[in-house]
């Protein structure tokens, strides 16, 4: 088929005129459409043979026509794609060249690069986290927050909103502050509990000697005054009395208890002491001081010796009413 009329050249179905593509033998060569030149049809081998024969001027005309054809294809593809998306169907539009999009028509390699960039952006978006700036509280704000924390460790939302308006802070910041303050308070409570357990450990309670059952019954049955309670309630002082001597080392070896003092008589002697009141300070006689020198005992250095000395004074106070009778 030979092309001799100019109107056929204006049509976009043919790319080159007959006189440009005639072979040297006079026979007309194959004519190619714009689709074949742009690569829509797989005729690359035939297209390569004619690229060398096309002049630069004709190449510019071909580029202009191809760009017009691409724009025309873009406008035709927009409306069918919208209708196709509304119907929810997939596939082609009945046109063998409809698989080519406008982006592929303009630049075939641009669509793949754009899709790769979109995928990389989607992968990077979850990794980005919004970092909140650290809130710096003023002295007034901390004072008001501490006062509110003393009133209630768990304020409700209305109290938090009122406090937030008072200290000019967002309610979320006030809530976070109370959470951190409660955590700090729990840590302090745990430290206090552990310190109390260390104080009450058995290593520190070995000095506490249990009281004998007989002495506890005696002290509970006797109506003693407050000034007699400390020495009698102490087991060390009670063991130093003559009626409760269990070891020979509790009193000096030269001391012998008087014959009128025994456990039975001591109970009768202690009964009228509740009505007598506190006795006057007892003055030891000269013979007693000479027999038991007190200079050898230092109450400030030895607590046991001081308790023994108090026990001796009570023993002498018990024996004095019997001697007068």
Curated annotation (Swiss-Prot):
Query: Residues annotated as region Disordered?
Result: 75-136
| Tissue expression notes | Highly expressed in anterior neural plate followed by neural retina, pigmented epithelium, in pineal gland, diencephalon floor and epiphysis. At later stages, the neuroretina remains the primary site of expression. No expression in the developing lens and cornea.
Q: Whereabouts does the entry annotate DNA binding, in residue ranges?
A: 130-189
Start-end of Basic and acidic residues biased regions? 75-87
Q: Where is the composition biased (Polar residues)?
A: 99-117
- Compartment(s) where it occurs, according to its Swiss-Prot or TrEMBL record: Nucleus
Instruction: Give the motif span (Octapeptide motif).
Output: 32-39
Q: Which GO terms describe its biological process?
A: positive regulation of transcription by RNA polymerase II; regulation of transcription by RNA polymerase II
Q: What family does the entry list?
A: Belongs to the paired homeobox family. Bicoid subfamily.
Q: List the protein's name.
A: Retinal homeobox protein Rx-B
Originating species: Xenopus laevis
């Amino acid at each position: 088929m030979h092309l001799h009329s100019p109107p056929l050249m204006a049509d976009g179905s043919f790319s080159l005129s007959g006189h440009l593509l005639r072979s040297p033998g006079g026979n007309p060569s194959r004519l190619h459409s714009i689709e074949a030149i742009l690569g829509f049809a797989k005729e690359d081998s035939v297209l390569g043979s004619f690229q060398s024969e096309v002049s630069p001027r004709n190449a510019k005309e071909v580029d202009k026509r191809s760009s017009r054809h691409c724009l025309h294809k873009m406008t035709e593809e927009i409306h069918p794609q919208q209708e196709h998306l509304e119907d929810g169907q997939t596939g082609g539009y009945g046109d063998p060249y409809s698989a080519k999009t406008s982006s592929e028509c303009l630049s075939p390699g641009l669509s793949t690069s754009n899709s790769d960039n979109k995928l990389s952006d989607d992968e990077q978006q979850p990794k980005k986290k919004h970092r909140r700036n650290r809130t710096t509280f003023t002295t007034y704000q901390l004072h008001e927050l501490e006062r509110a924390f003393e009133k209630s460790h768990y304020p409700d939302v209305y109290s938090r909103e009122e406090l937030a308006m008072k200290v000019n802070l967002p309610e979320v910041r006030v809530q976070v502050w109370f959470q951190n303050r409660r955590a700090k308070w729990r840590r302090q409570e745990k430290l206090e509990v552990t310190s109390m357990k260390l104080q009450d450990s058995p290593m520190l309670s070995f000095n506490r000697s249990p009281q004998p059952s007989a002495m506890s019954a005696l002290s509970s049955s006797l109506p003693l005054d407050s000034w007699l309670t400390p020495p009698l309630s102490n087991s060390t002082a009670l063991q130093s009395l003559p009626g409760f001597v269990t070891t020979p080392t509790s009193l000096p070896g030269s001391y012998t208890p008087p014959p009128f003092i025994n456990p039975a008589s001591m109970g009768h002697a202690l009964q009228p002491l509740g009505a007598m009141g506190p006795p006057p300070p007892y003055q030891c006689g000269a013979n007693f001081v000479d027999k038991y020198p007190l200079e050898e005992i230092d109450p400030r250095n030895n607590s046991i010796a001081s308790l023994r000395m108090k026990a001796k004074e009570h023993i002498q106070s018990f024996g004095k009413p019997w001697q007068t009778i």
